Amino acid sequence: MTKKVIRKPDSLHDVFERKGGSAPTATHYCAGCGHGILHKLIGEAMDELGIQERAVMISPVGCAVFAYYYFDCGNVQVAHGRAPAVGTGISRAEDDAVVILYQGDGDLASIGLNETIQAANRGEKLAVFFVNNTVYGMTGGQMAPTTLVGEVTVTCPTGRDPRYAGYPLHMCELLDNLQAPVFIERVSLADPKRIRRARRAIKRALEIQRDGKGYAFVEVLSPCPTNLRQDAEGAERFLKEEMEKEFPVKNFRDRSAETEPLIRSESDFSRESLDRIFQIREDSVPDPVDDPEFPEVRVKIAGFGGQGVLSMGLTLAQAACSEGRHTSWYPAYGPEQRGGTSSCGVVISGERVGSPAVDTPDVLVALNQPSLDEFADDVADGGIILYDSTTASFSGGAVRAMGVPALEIARKHGTARAANTVMLGVMMALGLTGLDEESFREAIKFTFAGKEKIIDMNLRILEAGAEWARENIEGEL
């Protein structure tokens, strides 16, 4: 014999301690508001499906922003319109989570419209409950994207005029044009019969999430008697005779039976996988050895994207690592593949590196004029600037500056793209980093491993740069 039990669902708190105030068992919603009904329907479905421990409720700005007062599950409050973005992140990071977006029309259909469409188009694993009461409820009843033509609100006191404000936005119809959504339905809370139908749709949307099948969207036509100045009968009549006429209550799509669970590949950030991807070998990067006698050297390399700025820094860092020095490499570059500003900082130290950022370099390598102009004043007292005199000029300053015809030397030895290697050779010959010359040569081999012709050419250019430095600069330091 079945026993009838009248109580709140387990997925809703019995006492709303988070809400506080003098009425801890009452919600903050107005009398006659549809949110309370919808909360119960969602809570009951969560209980029946056994998903309470997996559920994460996302509540953005609006009347339901305090949903975490009531739902006994994971809860995240988000900025206005950003529920789909946050929900996507949670769903993808926690693949087993049942992610529920609870949004109003002033949120989902306005500031959050683009993110809603994009999430639906991607078929994200989200159950979206869209509360349509035709107004911005929380802020006093202003016109919303779903406000009916002719409907009076605080911000359209003579009624919505489509000549100025357009027409009500039909979200179900809009999303039904997309391929990815699994389930789309519009329901109403106008009377008990309609509420029972709404209950079935809500449960189906959550079933789809339980089974990991993809995107489910339920639009809920809901009363807002306070802002629309309606009594109970007026609210019911408005839903049935006006809202349902504009927004037909029906199922637009249910592909759950033929849809397979959405299985995404698992991320693997293990050290072994990362080492394999980046071709890092234990024997190529020995553990650093503390050597307080070795002075810290901070190098900044700058130029255009495509000049080998970052690879020069990596090669220098590899040379330092091979000698067991504490080393960091820190890149900074724009979005352009070629031509944009690019720089990197390399710190070589006998002790643990405190910060990889090189704000006051001991050595500045500038491969073009803009980089020389931008960073020359940052060089530390006693530091040195190496710049490509083929493309830049320096009028002098408080630090030593040496013009190196790097581009000219590189062209002479086979390729203009190796001006960065010329600069490495100059640094090697001048001993600016305290590293052995052989470490530079081995670093070149490591950087271009498997490309023997490129290795041979860069080794020749490295030596050419070093030879030029010995003949033209070495005696000046």
Curated annotation (Swiss-Prot):
GO terms for molecular function: 3-methyl-2-oxobutanoate dehydrogenase (ferredoxin) activity; thiamine pyrophosphate binding. The keyword Oxidoreductase applies. One of its GO terms (biological process) is organic acid metabolic process. It comes from the Archaea. CDD domains: TPP_OGFOR. The keyword Mitochondrion does not apply. This is Ketoisovalerate oxidoreductase subunit VorA. It comes from Methanothermobacter thermautotrophicus (strain ATCC 29096 / DSM 1053 / JCM 10044 / NBRC 100330 / Delta H).
